[in-house]
Curated annotation (Swiss-Prot):
Gene name per UniProt: cas1
Organism annotation: Clostridium perfringens (strain SM101 / Type A)
Protein name according to UniProt: CRISPR-associated endonuclease Cas1
The protein's required cofactors: Mg(2+); Mn(2+)
EC top class, as a word: hydrolase
Lineage of origin: Bacteria, Bacillati, Bacillota, Clostridia, Eubacteriales
InterPro entries: CRISPR-assoc_Cas1, CRISPR-assoc_Cas1_C, CRISPR-assoc_Cas1_HMARI/TNEAP, CRISPR-assoc_Cas1_N
Family of this protein: Belongs to the CRISPR-associated endonuclease Cas1 family.
Cystine crosslinks: none
Length: 330
């Protein structure tokens, strides 16, 4: 099993025999054995050619591209080896059955709210009012009849959740402050952390979907569109509070991230290269952390939990068993 590699410098990628070389514009080279690469994340300005893409396609390496501010721009992935016409038809039929689609969407958000509440209850002396508000939105969501109602309850719950961030920040006694969630563009360090973390989460989920027979463009909570892998957005809802928020709180709590790790350009606040490296290190550590799985009776990593979620969705779509989303028990 390969690993993720991150390229922050500007340069070019070349292939020599069975090794990929990254060469920066000063002539420094670093070899990356192709068998060891599972995903390649490119943050710098990097030149590559079709020969390179044809070569890595044989090994099903997923390439994710990020813009100047570190936000996800798109992916290159080879022709899928794991395909199933039956599953594709069932995945589309599930979307076309509106009542069934709403039911699936509700399970994603119920899991997300479970993990949001889990985070809040760790600081219960500071967050009790937010817990009550989100629990109320969770009840409303469970009675929803439309996707709009589901997303409305989710949006209100997440707004309350983000309002609780200052309770966390004050409790942790640090220099960060958070007014409200601003996505386009992020305008302060906390918003920059959330946006960058969510962007990484989407690419991680996409990578796990890609290993299965699921089609990443057919989704249930988020409306499918022509320019996004919307199923990764659906499944990321489950894991953002469990992984991304946990990393953010941990880094702030331990003083691992500083204001010097952020830059601002024309009102856009973003993690600079040093900040991105710090975040990715902790993010990868979180993904590799293991828990004892109650059903499988073995240790599984957080990354594997994402793929297991894909498999559970497949079983539901094939009619093998009901879908029960992950709800952290540890």
């Amino acid at each position: 099993m390969g690993r993720d590699y991150y390229i922050f410098s500007n340069g070019r990628i070349k292939r020599k025999e069975n090794t990929i070389y990254f060469e920066d514009f000063e002539g420094n080279k670093k070899g990356l054995p192709i068998e060891d690469i599972e995903r390649l994340h490119i943050f710098g300005e990097v030149d590559l050619n079709t020969k390179f893409l044809n070569y890595i396609s044989r090994y099903s390496v997923l390439i994710s591209i990020y813009n100047y501010y570190g936000f996800y721009s798109g992916s290159y992935y080879s022709k899928k080896k794991n395909v199933s016409g039956v599953l594709l038809v069932n995945q589309a039929l599930a979307y076309d059955n509106y009542e069934f689609r709403v039911a699936i969407a509700k399970t994603f958000i119920d899991s997300a709210m479970h993990h949001i509440l889990r985070n809040l209850r760790r600081y219960k002396e500071k967050t009790s009012e937010f817990v009550k508000a989100i629990e109320n939105e969770r009840k409303i969501m469970k009675e929803a009849k439309t996707i709009e109602e589901v997303m409305g309850a989710e949006g209100r719950a997440r707004k309350k959740y983000y309002e609780s961030y200052n309770a966390f920040l004050k409790f942790l006694k640090n220099d960060f402050h958070f007014n409200k969630r601003e996505k386009k563009p992020p305008n302060d360090p906390i918003n920059a952390l959330i946006s960058f973390g969510n962007s990484m989460m989407y690419t991680t989920v996409l990578g796990e979907i890609y290993k299965t027979q699921l089609d990443p463009t057919i989704s249930y909570l988020h409306e499918p569109s022509t320019k996004r892998f919307s199923l990764s957005l659906d499944l990321a809802e489950i894991f953002k509070p469990l992984i991304v928020d946990s990393v953010i709180f941990n880094m702030i709590n331990k003083g691992m991230i500083k204001k010097s790790d952020f830059d601002t350009d024309e009102g856009i606040c973003y993690l600079n290269e040093n900040g991105r490296k710090k975040f990715i290190k902790e993010y990868e550590n979180k993904l590799s952390t293991t828990v004892r799985h109650r059903t499988l009776n073995r240790n599984v990593s957080y990354r594997e939990l994402i793929r297991l979620e894909c498999y559970k969705l497949i079983k539901m779509l094939l009619g093998d068993e009901d879908y029960k989303p992950l709800k952290a028990w540890w």
